[in-house]
Design a protein with these regions (language model features):
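Sec-dependent bacterial lipoprotein signal peptides
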Residues: 1-19
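Soluble, non-membrane globular domain cores that form compact, hydrophobic packing
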Residues: 13, 21-154
Length: 154
């Protein structure tokens, strides 16, 4: 009986440890889920896309889009010119350090400034390791959906 209890206790402890050691959220997976649930289509640009396929990108290309030579987070996913929302754009950066997070926030703020021309048609959400920006038309829906996506991936 003691052996059974010990085995059950060890299994329970193992499950608890594994659950607490989850990996960081993946930008590509989060953006894919967001696009699907929001109903937008377009190419997701990410370093997770194999070279030669639609969506393959490099830090050099991202630095040109976001007009930065600063630190660029290594995990990101961006949809440019969403087909279902009048050419809107959205992106997520998953940051491993405060320097990456600060750079991602600055990059997104500058991108939103350029895209929206200060007309209030933009959304920037900083949540833990993730920085998300959007120019999608329905800000409230995008924000609610993004928060659900973040919760399901962390």
């Amino acid at each position: 009986m003691r052996r059974v209890a010990l085995v059950v206790l060890l299994l329970f402890a193992s499950v608890c440890i594994l659950a607490s050691c989850r990996e960081s959220p993946d930008a590509y997976d989060m953006m894919r889920d967001f696009a699907r649930d929001y109903g937008i289509s377009g190419v997701i640009y990410s370093p997770d896309v194999p070279e030669g396929e639609d969506g393959y990108t490099t830090p050099e290309l991202i630095s040109r889009i976001y007009l930065t030579g600063e630190v660029i987070p290594s995990d990101y996913a961006v949809i440019l010119n969403c087909r279902a929302d009048y050419g809107a754009e959205c992106g997520v950066f998953v940051c491993d350090s405060e320097a990456e997070r600060a750079a991602a926030i600055e990059m997104c703020e500058e991108r939103l400034r350029i895209l929206s021309r200060g007309d209030g048609t933009s959304l920037l959400i900083r949540s833990g390791k993730t920085v998300f920006y959007s120019t999608l038309t329905d800000h409230e829906r995008a924000e609610d959906l993004w928060r659900k996506i973040v919760a399901s991936h962390t």
